[in-house]
Amino acid sequence: MEQQYTTLTKDINNIDNKDAIVYAYIKSRMNYKTSIADNVTEKEISEKLGISLSTVKRSVERLKKNKNLIDKVISNNVIAEGSYKTYNKYHVAKCNEDFFYIYNSFFNDDMNIAKASERTKLKNFLLKLKTICKKETNKYISESPYLDGLNKTELSKKLGIDTKTLNKNLEMAVNAGQIKYITNGLLILNKSIIPDFKKDDTDTRIYHIIYDWCIDNGVVPPDRNDEIKIMEDGSIRRKNSLLPVSYTHLTLPTIR
């Protein structure tokens, strides 16, 4: 069965606290034909993400005011199981052209972290990190590398957090096997965060097989090396040389 996925605008890097992961979960419940996430309770979000109900309520209030993410929210209060429940209908704003994809398995990933609140904090960090990765990759490359490695001061400014918080997040992410340091930057290892895009064509399927093999075997994946051509009718044609010379030695699974 094909995995379900969600598209997320890179504008989530401009929101604070745990709002990115809360928005991502709401978006994952959206009907793509109507752009509506219906019958989503704040209690459901709290239980699914492992964060307090009060934190979710504050996050939802902030998201309601951000028209780049949520157009409007219609609340319906009902009595269920002897108590009031508020079901929200979220009219989700249309993504601009700058977005990325995640598999919905991301929300169920325990990341080998026992504490749910810590998992959610890390997931929120990974989503925001993805927004500033090199286009169609899960690699963040420093503009001004420090000793051929990650420039943490630069990264903290791009994420809008202080370096102390960044260091804690990076340490947790490395220990949980969610990122690794590479030359001049770092690589997101979580395979629920799609490096490029979700498309059912042979080139993309082959690239994802190569990509997953690399992640599983400790190899830094090759970038998608598409040649992009915009046609007269405005359509986009991609041509992909799938196996760069440096990766032709890899033994990959057979495509069926």
Language-model segments: residues:
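Short recognition helix of helix-turn-helix/winged-helix DNA-binding domains
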Residues: M1-E44, K48, E61, K65-L69, ...
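Short helix-coil junctions and helix-kink-helix linkers
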Residues: K43-S52, K152-D162
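Short amphipathic alpha-helical interaction segments
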Residues: S52-R62, D162-M172
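A short, conserved structural fragment
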Residues: K65-N76, V174-N184
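Short, cationic-aromatic polyanion-contact patches
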Residues: S75-D98, N184-I206
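Short, amphipathic alpha-helical interaction segments positioned at domain boundaries
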Residues: H91-D109, D196-D223
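Short linear proline/tyrosine/threonine-rich motifs used for host-factor recruitment
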Residues: I236-R238
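Conserved small/polar residues in nucleotide/adenosyl-binding loops
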Residues: V245-T254
